[in-house]
Regions:
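A compositional/biophysical signature of low hydrophobicity enriched in polar/charged and small residues
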Residues: 2-118
Length: 118
């Protein structure tokens, strides 16, 4: 799914699913008033992305971050910058897409496609 940025520029929405490590927990327990949201907003802005939210979760992932970015490379730069900091163990990136738009495109070409013969 894309959001319109300017006349000809669009940004895609990305979900960052992260797993924090002991270093993150130790740092936050030493200074629980740290505003990690502000840090991520600044990182996103420096790369031309828009930060939306940072949520801590229970389950397979400890944290979910939502941002709009102009391309996957920007999202990947955000991921590697955070990972390089050492307090996050891993981050998976999911790119949101418009299923209806995909379905229209796929439907427009499926009748003309033939699978390879066995």
């Amino acid at each position: 799914m894309t959001t319109r940025l300017a006349k000809e520029h669009y940004m895609s929405k990305y979900l960052f699913l992260g797993k924090i490590n002991q270093e993150y927990i130790s740092g936050m327990l030493q200074n629980p008033d740290q505003d990690r949201t502000a840090v991520l907003k600044n990182l996103a802005a420096a790369l031309g992305a828009d930060f939306h939210s940072l949520e801590f979760t229970r389950g397979a992932y400890d944290v979910v971050c939502i941002c709009d970015a102009p391309d996957f490379e920007t999202a990947l730069a955000m991921k590697t910058t955070v990972i390089r900091g050492g307090a996050v163990a891993s981050i998976d990136i999911l790119e949101v897409f418009d299923f209806n738009q995909y379905a229209h495109k796929a439907a427009s070409v499926t009748s003309g496609y033939k699978a390879p013969a066995a």
